[in-house]
Amino acid sequence: MYNDLKNRSTAERAEMLTRRLVGIKSYTRTLGETEKVKEIYSIIKSFPYFQKHPEDVWIQSIAGDPYNRINVWAKLKGRQKKTVLFHSHIDTVETDDFGTLQSLAHDPDALQQYFSTYEGDERVKEQALSGDWLFGRGSLDMQSGAAIHLTNLLELSEQKDSLDGTMLFLFNPDEESEHAGMLAALQELQRMKDEGLKYVAAINNDFIAPMHDQDDTKYIYTGAAGKVLPSFYIYGREAHVGDVLTSIDPTLVASEINRKINQNLDLVEELEGEYVLPPACLYFKEDKHSYNVQTAVSARMYFNYFVFELTAKDVMDKLLSVTRETVEELRIQSERRYDEFRIHHGFPPSNWKWEVAVCTYEDLQNELRNKGLPVDKVLDRVAKEWKGKDRREASFALVEALQQLDPDKKPRVILFFAPPFLPHNYLNEQYEYGTEIREKLVKRLEVVTAESNETFATKRFFPYLADGSYLSLHETEEEVNVLKKNMPRMSDIYPLPIDLIRSVNIPSINIGVYGRDGHKWTERVYKPYTFHVLPGLIKNFALDLVAKKERTQ
């Protein structure tokens, strides 16, 4: 591959590598992820420096991974231990959204030709005709990002002897799902830290996009949003449809809770200048397995909930309050409806009550233990049965098993957290290099603005999901314990290396590729900025971070 790159400009190298990577399918949770990492490994090994120093590029197997996925690392050792980590994920979402054009999803030229005559979206057509945009699955998210890191790896390897600090590169799978690549990478990062590397910062280049149609600002993020997955198991009281008003219908309860939480802007954190999204329902299901005329017994749902400064405890407290309020409103409504129906038909008063408890997973365990019930024995059995299966379904199975253990079969709404959990992080001025990173970023952006006429804005939090969330942890031990106590069998189902994340402690800066329509069939990356401006910005900022004295170029 090096022979195809060596006589080309930086921009040409970046585009050529992007096209090469887009052409290889690497859908999350498929063997294609491993094939792409192997291709990247092969590309790196073709670079002259790594021909002479093969020990500085290596593959890391992801222990216990069902798809046998791997990470690839490359290191350029500098004159001092100060180190910058460049990281990029190589997986993509699948291509079902392309419909009949699925065969073209990995062919940028064919897609550009198609969109050049496309009448369904005038902007897409205009941009295809301009030649400034490269189309294809992963072109934006984020094969172009991996390509730019490869381009910079090549160029930095060509000036390796003059590097003040160490440059470390990671290309990993599984960002779009469970972050297995980055979580495995923590072990390597800790190993190298123990061997003497001193991490200053990490640079991710996950994609950025316009906030609105007139927006051409390029956003730089000095931290990353976190995420929790608050989950609800609703256990009701079944009834024949001929006696429906005496039921406690879990679908009704779930629907009302969903209405109060889903896309509710009142639940959004107020952070000046930051792009903060509301909670979103990702899963909603009642638990009937076949048709009959009995109302459902239980229902389940979970929400994507971004956190910026909030902790898991804050989210739990908020949602408990919303749920209790909703359940009380439903109690009043249901009892009123029952009385109206009874009076309308001339039935005598009854002692029927609509009562639903609201509790956390921790509360439920404590209640059952206080009754002398074998909580741990049941959890051990269910965790063993669900080992290696979907972690969210496993979590629901554990909660359901505890509910079934209750001899009273009390109707309940049980609130808990399911995997994954992404810590939020941000550039902390108290961190050893915090002030230095911010000052050097400002200066570098001033230089690039003068050279390119680009407009930049710095934000505290990358507002979407990113691997960089796992590189540091700001929650206190008490705050983490709320998560641990309310994520069913976290140590078995989702053994998150909390202590390792806290130990590695690398601030992650996102300086992303730029384009439109990530995860859509019209996905495309903007070449003039991404291939011409961004590589130099990232490379020079990294050199700034490890420089022994202030750089003037």
Segments and roles (model prediction):
Residues 160-162, 221-227, 291-297, 405-408, ...:
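Short glycine/proline-enriched loop/turn "hinge" motifs that connect secondary-structure elements
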Residues 150-158, 256-263, 539-543:
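Short glycine/serine- and small hydrophobic-enriched flexible loop segments
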Residues 92, 232-239, 307, 512-520:
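A glycine-centered beta->alpha junction motif in the catalytic cores
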Residues 2-137, 158, 162-165:
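Acidic/His- and Gly-rich active-site-bordering loop/insert found
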Residues 31, 134-147, 244-251, 528-532:
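Short, conserved micro-motifs enriched in small and acidic residues
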